[in-house]
Amino acid sequence: MKKFDPAVYKKRKCECLDKCFQAFMDNGLENTGLQLLCKYCGFKTNQALYHYFESKDMIITESVQYAMIKFEREFMKKAPRSRADLKNYLEKFPRWMQKNYGEHMRFVYQVYTSPKYKKQGYDFFSGIPKRYDTFIHHIAKNLDVSFESIQALYYLYITSTLQFALFKDEVYLDVEVNAI
């Protein structure tokens, strides 16, 4: 019998979260059952999926949270490293984000605005200010400005970027980016 390895378990669960998120994106929540999730994950039986998750609802919420954390990391990797990078970042990043993550963001929005998953959405989003503030401290250091001078502007930028990713509203984006 194989010995339980927490690192292998975590790695495999993360792979499942990625694949399950993709299954939901490809097929929608209603059209994605456990058999289809197993197929995406390469499992032969539902039991293998239950090794990692207690229910389909848990798969939905954990895969969305996992995707959002990955998105946040990507968002943070693209941050300006100097003042010279700032204009390019402000102008180009929202469009890159919409192109690469627009569908993901619409799906996340769909899940977290559903009455069924509203609490999980609140729980997840309640941690965002702390994560973003940590990120903004990093950007402030890179740009040699105070945290206080850019915090509100960066929150506005993040909101504008997400709004654009969801709805492709160029006017809203341009007005807010120009204000920043």
Question: Language model features by range: what are they?
Answer:
Residues Q98-Y122, L166:
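Amphipathic alpha-helical segments used for helix-helix packing
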Residues E62, F75-Y101, S146-F147, Y154:
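Hydrophobic alpha-helical connector segments
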Residues K10-D18, E30, H51-M76, P80:
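An amphipathic alpha-helix adjacent to DNA-recognition modules
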Residues M1-K10:
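N-terminal intrinsically disordered/low-complexity leader segments
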Residues E72, M76, Y117-F147, Q151:
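Amphipathic alpha-helical packing segments from all-alpha helical-bundle domains
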Residues R12, K56, S63, A67, ...:
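Hydrophobic/aromatic residues within well-ordered alpha-helical segments
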Residues F125-S126, I139-I180:
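Hydrophobic/aromatic-rich alpha-helical bundle segments in the mid-to-C-terminal region
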Residues A23-M58, E62:
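Helix-turn-helix
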